[in-house]
Amino acid sequence: MSLCLWKQCLDRLQSELPSTEFSMWIRSLKAKLNNNILEIYAPNQFILDWVKDKYLIHFKKILQDFCGSNSPFIKFKVYQTSKEKKFKKNILQKIQNLNAKPIWDKIPIFKKSSHRSNINKKHSFENFIEGKSNQLARAAASQVAKNPGNSYNPLFLYGGTGLGKTHLLHAIGNGILAYKYNVKIIYMHSERFVQDMVKALQNNAIEKFKLYYRSVDALLIDDIQFFAHKERSQEEFFHTFNALLEGNQQIILTSDRYPKEINGVEDRLKSRFGWGLTVAIDPPELETRVAILIKKADENNIVLSDEVAFFIAKHLRSNVRELEGALNRVIVNANFTHRSITVEFVREALRDILALQEKLVTIANIQKTVAEYYKIKVADLLSRRRSRSVARPRQMAMAMAKELTNHSLPEIGDAFSGRDHTTVLHACRKIEQLRKENHDIKEDFSNLIRTLSV
């Protein structure tokens, strides 16, 4: 009975949550029903706390639907594998043995590693601005930093330029170093791996190359898509990847696209990229963009009003790097001219950027891009046809227009053959709902945002 009820809960959640979210937080849970108490077990405290905070309401509602007034009480616990129990038992035994004699002379002196990790200490989880667009990626990265080699291995982060992938890579590296002593971590761009391999081949030192890369505790590689069409590098990385995974050594990779969409990379590598957890980082939503601007201004000892932050965030939508660049320009101009940072001042300081944005993102451009993406005609979007193959892309285009332009709902409706503003509002709400429930719609939305923001 307990297994049947738990399976029903999982099936329901799987149908309601995006596949990435379900795989990341729910799939690893176990459960047992005893005396009308449903004990839900998580593999570690981090996942337990997250699930309890984010999904307890979901579980209660599902149980209410299935069991009515007889719904079981929910308890959360951390489960341990037999391997973990044995490990803890051995540790406790060693501690007991050590307590019987002085141990001060046996404490190891940890020395700073001689290798260069290339980890940038400025990038941490604390100064990474979290929002809906990057929440899962940050949570996964944090978990990997606390438990490298055992949580989500490999971790694959993907998304457009300037969205925070590199920041999270460095944050993971700093996090691991904060939790563990004397670990060997290497951060690098994929081109550095290629260069090192070529140099090793030229110097007849390939065995040293292999030993170096396979002896790390964590390997962090940025922009893995640059391995494309480099067969020898892919071959060597394939074997390095396998060796690290077998040794429970952590691998974290980033790319500007989903693993299966990386052209020029062998299928066996792309398959391995997806063995752990693959998480997208989307362009930041308006609230996150505002928070990023205010945080960055504060770091520069600048007080940025909500009105100004909102104005900049509303007009610059593509990525964090673009936001920071615009803010830096505003700050430099303000310092140089000794003027206050107002909306009018920002409009003047960023006039060329704002003009370019207005020129690039138009409703007509959105309609053309969406039509091409869904392989239909722009005329179909503007028609009165209501078949799903046309209606869903039309709703997506309307939602894009609201997200990426400053046009009002009536203006957007006019651009779609004079539709009423309530139709546009319904389309926007529908797409927002589907993005939460349907992984394909969420991916479509992210892909279109990236395309239109380039």
Swiss-Prot record:
<keyword id="KW-0446">Lipid-binding</keyword>
<feature type="region of interest" description="Domain III, AAA+ region">
    <location>
        <begin position="118"/>
        <end position="334"/>
    </location>
</feature>
<feature type="binding site">
    <location>
        <position position="162"/>
    </location>
    <ligand>
        <name>ATP</name>
    </ligand>
</feature>
<feature type="region of interest" description="Domain II">
    <location>
        <begin position="79"/>
        <end position="117"/>
    </location>
</feature>
<dbReference type="GO" id="GO:0005886">
    <property type="term" value="C:plasma membrane"/>
</dbReference>
<dbReference type="InterPro" id="IPR020591">
    <property type="entry name" value="Chromosome_initiator_DnaA-like"/>
</dbReference>
<dbReference type="Pfam" id="PF00308">
    <property type="entry name" value="Bac_DnaA"/>
</dbReference>
<feature type="binding site">
    <location>
        <position position="164"/>
    </location>
    <ligand>
        <name>ATP</name>
    </ligand>
</feature>
<keyword id="KW-0235">DNA replication</keyword>
<feature type="binding site">
    <location>
        <position position="166"/>
    </location>
    <ligand>
        <name>ATP</name>
    </ligand>
</feature>
<feature type="region of interest" description="Domain I, interacts with DnaA modulators">
    <location>
        <begin position="1"/>
        <end position="79"/>
    </location>
</feature>
<dbReference type="GO" id="GO:0006270">
    <property type="term" value="P:DNA replication initiation"/>
</dbReference>
<comment type="similarity">
    <text>Belongs to the DnaA family.</text>
</comment>
<dbReference type="GO" id="GO:0008289">
    <property type="term" value="F:lipid binding"/>
</dbReference>
<protein>
    <recommendedName>
        <fullName>Chromosomal replication initiator protein DnaA</fullName>
    </recommendedName>
</protein>
<feature type="region of interest" description="Domain IV, binds dsDNA">
    <location>
        <begin position="335"/>
        <end position="454"/>
    </location>
</feature>
<dbReference type="InterPro" id="IPR018312">
    <property type="entry name" value="Chromosome_initiator_DnaA_CS"/>
</dbReference>
<dbReference type="GO" id="GO:0005524">
    <property type="term" value="F:ATP binding"/>
</dbReference>
<dbReference type="GO" id="GO:0005737">
    <property type="term" value="C:cytoplasm"/>
</dbReference>
<dbReference type="Pfam" id="PF08299">
    <property type="entry name" value="Bac_DnaA_C"/>
</dbReference>
<dbReference type="InterPro" id="IPR024633">
    <property type="entry name" value="DnaA_N_dom"/>
</dbReference>
<comment type="subunit">
    <text>Oligomerizes as a right-handed, spiral filament on DNA at oriC.</text>
</comment>
<dbReference type="InterPro" id="IPR010921">
    <property type="entry name" value="Trp_repressor/repl_initiator"/>
</dbReference>
<dbReference type="InterPro" id="IPR001957">
    <property type="entry name" value="Chromosome_initiator_DnaA"/>
</dbReference>
<keyword id="KW-0547">Nucleotide-binding</keyword>
<dbReference type="InterPro" id="IPR038454">
    <property type="entry name" value="DnaA_N_sf"/>
</dbReference>
<feature type="binding site">
    <location>
        <position position="165"/>
    </location>
    <ligand>
        <name>ATP</name>
    </ligand>
</feature>
<comment type="function">
    <text>Plays an essential role in the initiation and regulation of chromosomal replication. ATP-DnaA binds to the origin of replication (oriC) to initiate formation of the DNA replication initiation complex once per cell cycle. Binds the DnaA box (a 9 base pair repeat at the origin) and separates the double-stranded (ds)DNA. Forms a right-handed helical filament on oriC DNA; dsDNA binds to the exterior of the filament while single-stranded (ss)DNA is stabiized in the filament's interior.</text>
</comment>
<keyword id="KW-0067">ATP-binding</keyword>
<keyword id="KW-0963">Cytoplasm</keyword>
<dbReference type="GO" id="GO:0006275">
    <property type="term" value="P:regulation of DNA replication"/>
</dbReference>
<dbReference type="InterPro" id="IPR027417">
    <property type="entry name" value="P-loop_NTPase"/>
</dbReference>
<dbReference type="Pfam" id="PF11638">
    <property type="entry name" value="DnaA_N"/>
</dbReference>
<dbReference type="GO" id="GO:0016887">
    <property type="term" value="F:ATP hydrolysis activity"/>
</dbReference>
<keyword id="KW-0238">DNA-binding</keyword>
<dbReference type="InterPro" id="IPR013159">
    <property type="entry name" value="DnaA_C"/>
</dbReference>
<dbReference type="InterPro" id="IPR013317">
    <property type="entry name" value="DnaA_dom"/>
</dbReference>
<dbReference type="InterPro" id="IPR003593">
    <property type="entry name" value="AAA+_ATPase"/>
</dbReference>
<dbReference type="GO" id="GO:0003688">
    <property type="term" value="F:DNA replication origin binding"/>
</dbReference>
